[in-house]
């Protein structure tokens, strides 16, 4: 772009310089002709015309500068190559409006999407909070359930231990009962073997001890029976049902059963202590009775002795050790009376013993069944404990799963929070980019309005300049016609001057001939005195004619010399003015070069900023694609815009190449036209000084143009590495390089 701007600036400057030179030459020639043809009164008008022309030239230069500046702006800010490309400018403005509408719609869409993201974020927050609250409540419930299960396990373990203790106590009681039964059998067999029917009264010591012990035991048994009477009659029938229901019933029945178990534990402990005491007392009583014979024993109290197993084995918790001391303590000593029906009584006793044995067997079988049922219940309790342990394991697993799910939910929540933060940052970035785009759009709109105003003003100025150009062109054509007429007049005057010179030479030759004739005539006068007067008259006339001719030639020569001197002075003044203008143009060119360098720096900075913006825009596009996959349409639109921009770049490069070729052709034409202008300038003036000045001046301009062109090409050569062969070809054309020199330039590394 900068090389193209430089080439176009050089083209415009060269054309402006050439037009200024031609116009100045025309004006100088016209001024000279007017000065030669008109009188001194018209000199002021010529000066005013010259001033007007200078003002017109200044206005044209200002317009040209404005046009060049506007063209620079267009070439920098737009893909347009020149001001004349109105269709391209219209397309550019339409593209700008279309892009503005697209950006506005995109910004609106992004704002709507950001709002949707905010609403989604809030909804997700509420959902996650609800889920977290639910999970916390579930965790608390599960913790409470786990604590309840732990309490139930502990209670069940305690119950199992208590049941094991009860089973052990029952087994010990059963063993004790069997021992007591065996001892009773032994006593009865001894009694049957004894033939002596009399029963002696026990001693007073043993009776006193037994009566005291019986009183104490009665009191204890009454207290225990009052406590246990309500439970013992029910426990035997309902224990199996209670234990089976305790496995399936809820936690309330388990608590009640635990209370029953505690009460049973207390009763078992009390019964154990009482058993120990009763066993000790029974041992004393049995020992006392064993020492003394049973002579005073009444068989009327045997009913109680025979019926006690039924009461004992009615429930498995009432032991024989509790009932046997009562039987022996309730025996009252009676007087011995001999009865003849003792064998019958013995038979009845034996029958009752057999019945008691059968009842004992039945009770033992029932006890075994109860023990087996208790074992089965213990097994069921163990199974229930294993089930509870499995449930606890499942609860723990559920807890672990809930904790892991809570952790995953927390991680997902953190990820969602990060995503939301990223979305917020993206939203802020998009808002910033939106504000930046809005500011850029506002600046573009203002610049567009300014450009439109400038375009309208420039159109007006261009129309005015075109009108002035047409007027100046018409005046220039008229002046060219006048100049042609003046040139024709000059040629005719030159021919007349030549004819006058030739006539002067002829007259001088005639004068010399006439002087010779005079000498001859004087000789003849001497010889012939008669014709002397006539000859004198003729000589005087010839001298007068010669003097007149001399004066006329001198006057004509002086007039021509003065005219030529004035023309030379005017040409010298125009040369000085043109040199000053060339200096000013050179200064302007230097200023333009400095401005071009500054614009290069600005353009590089703008390119860097554009690259950074493009990178940030690509990152934002990637983020928007990751957050919102529905932005395919905007990406396709951007891709289409990029394709259109690439097409515009290709078109601009093609235009640049076309302009470069046209510049070459114009530059070659200028080179060809410069020698003809040089010959024309040399034909107008004959003086050697004017010819030398006119021949040196265009050459210096050509050198300046060549230097600027080569400088620009070298800058391009240093900047653009991709197009190095084209620039080498241009340098070879300009500098007349050989192929070896071309290869050297191409092989040089920068």
From Swiss-Prot:
Positions with biased composition (Basic residues): 214-230
Domain GRIP, chain residue ranges per copy: 700-748
SMART domains associated with the record: Grip
Localization annotation: Cytoplasm
Domain of life: Eukaryota
Keyword Ribonucleoprotein appears in the UniProt entry: no
Keywords: Coiled coil, Cytoplasm
Region (Disordered): 14-53, 188-280, 672-703
Compositionally biased intervals (Basic and acidic residues): 18-34, 188-198, 269-280, 694-703
Biased composition (Polar residues): 201-213, 233-251
Major site of localization recorded for this protein: cytoplasm
UniProt feature, compositional bias: Low complexity: 676-693
Coiled coil: 28-182, 213-243, 344-665
Alphabetical list of Pfam families matching this protein: GRIP (PF01465)
Any one of the GO CC terms: cytosol
One example of a Gene Ontology biological process annotation: Golgi to plasma membrane protein transport
Protein name: GRIP and coiled-coil domain-containing protein C27D7.02c
Source organism phylogeny: Eukaryota, Fungi, Dikarya, Ascomycota, Taphrinomycotina
């Amino acid at each position: 772009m900068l090389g193209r701007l430089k080439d176009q600036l050089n083209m415009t400057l060269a054309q402006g310089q050439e037009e200024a030179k031609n116009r100045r030459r025309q004006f100088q020639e016209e001024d000279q002709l007017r000065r030669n043809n008109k009188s001194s009164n018209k000199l002021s008008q010529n000066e005013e015309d010259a001033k007007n022309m200078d003002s017109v030239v200044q206005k044209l230069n200002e317009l040209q500068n404005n046009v060049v500046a506007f063209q620079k702006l267009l070439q920098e800010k737009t893909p347009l190559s020149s001001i004349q490309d109105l269709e391209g400018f219209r397309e550019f403005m339409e593209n700008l409006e279309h892009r503005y509408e697209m950006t506005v719609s995109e910004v609106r869409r992004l704002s709507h999407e950001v709002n949707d993201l905010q609403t989604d974020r809030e909804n997700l927050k509420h959902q996650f909070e609800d889920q977290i609250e639910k999970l916390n409540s579930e965790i608390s419930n599960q913790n409470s359930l786990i604590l309840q299960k732990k309490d139930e396990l502990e209670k069940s373990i305690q119950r199992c231990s208590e049941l094991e203790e009860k089973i052990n106590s029952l087994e010990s009681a059963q063993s004790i009962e069997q021992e007591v039964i065996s001892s009773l059998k032994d006593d009865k067999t001894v009694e049957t073997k004894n033939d002596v029917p009399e029963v002696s009264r026990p001693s007073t010591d043993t009776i006193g001890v037994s009566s005291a012990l019986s009183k104490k035991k009665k009191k204890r048994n009454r207290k225990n029976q009052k406590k246990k009477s309500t439970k013992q009659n029910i426990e035997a029938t309902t224990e199996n049902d209670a234990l089976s229901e305790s496995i399936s019933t809820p936690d309330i029945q388990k608590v009640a059963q635990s209370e029953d178990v505690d009460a049973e534990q207390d009763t078992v402990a009390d019964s154990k202590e009482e058993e120990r005491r009763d066993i000790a007392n029974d041992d004393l009583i049995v020992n006392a009775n064993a020492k003394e014979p049973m002579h005073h024993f009444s068989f009327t109290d045997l009913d109680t002795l025979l019926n006690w197993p039924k009461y004992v084995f009615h429930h498995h918790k009432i032991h024989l050790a509790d009932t046997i001391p009562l039987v022996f303590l309730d025996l009252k000593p009676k007087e011995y009376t001999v009865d003849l029906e003792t064998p019958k009584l013995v038979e009845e006793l034996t029958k009752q013993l057999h019945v008691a044995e059968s009842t004992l067997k039945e009770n033992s079988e029932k006890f075994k069944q109860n023990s087996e049922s208790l074992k089965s219940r213990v097994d069921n309790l163990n199974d229930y404990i294993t089930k509870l342990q499995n449930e606890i394991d499942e609860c723990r697993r559920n807890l672990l799963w809930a904790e892991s799910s809570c952790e995953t939910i927390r991680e997902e929540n953190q990820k969602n929070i990060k995503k939301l933060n990223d979305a917020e940052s993206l939203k802020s970035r998009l808002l910033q980019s939106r504000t930046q785009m809005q500011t850029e759009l506002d600046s573009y709109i203002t610049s567009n309005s300014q450009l439109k105003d400038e375009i309208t003003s420039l159109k007006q100025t261009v129309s005015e300049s075109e009108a002035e150009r047409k007027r100046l062109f018409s005046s220039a054509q008229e002046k060219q016609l006048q100049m042609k007429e003046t040139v024709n007049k000059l040629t005719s005057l030159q021919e007349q001057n030549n004819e006058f010179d030739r006539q002067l030479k002829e007259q001088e030759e005639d004068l010399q001939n006439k002087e010779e004739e005079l000498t001859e005539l004087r000789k003849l006068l001497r010889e012939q005195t008669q014709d002397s007067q006539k000859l004198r008259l003729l000589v005087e006339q010839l001298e007068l004619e010669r003097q007149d001719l001399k004066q006329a030639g001198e006057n004509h020569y002086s007039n021509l010399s003065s005219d030529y001197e004035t023309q030379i002075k005017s040409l010298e003044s125009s040369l000085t003015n043109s040199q000053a203008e060339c200096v000013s143009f050179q200064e302007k060119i230097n200023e333009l070069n400095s401005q071009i360098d500054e614009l290069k720096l600005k353009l590089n900075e703008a390119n860097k900023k554009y690259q950074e913006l493009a990178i940030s825009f690509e990152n934002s596009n990637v983020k928007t694609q990751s957050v919102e996959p529905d932005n395919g349409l905007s990406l396709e639109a951007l891709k289409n815009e990029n394709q259109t921009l690439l097409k515009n770049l290709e078109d601009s490069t093609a235009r640049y190449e076309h302009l470069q070729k046209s510049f070459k052709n114009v530059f070659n034409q200028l080179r060809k036209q410069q020698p003809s202008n040089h010959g024309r300038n040399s034909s107008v003036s004959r003086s050697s000084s004017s010819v030398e000045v006119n021949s040196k001046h265009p050459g210096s301009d050509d050198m300046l143009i060549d230097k600027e062109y080569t400088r620009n090409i070298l800058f391009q050569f240093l900047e653009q590495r991709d197009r190095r062969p084209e620039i080498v070809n241009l340098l070879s054309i300009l500098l007349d390089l050989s192929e070896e020199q071309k290869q050297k330039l191409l092989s040089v590394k920068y």
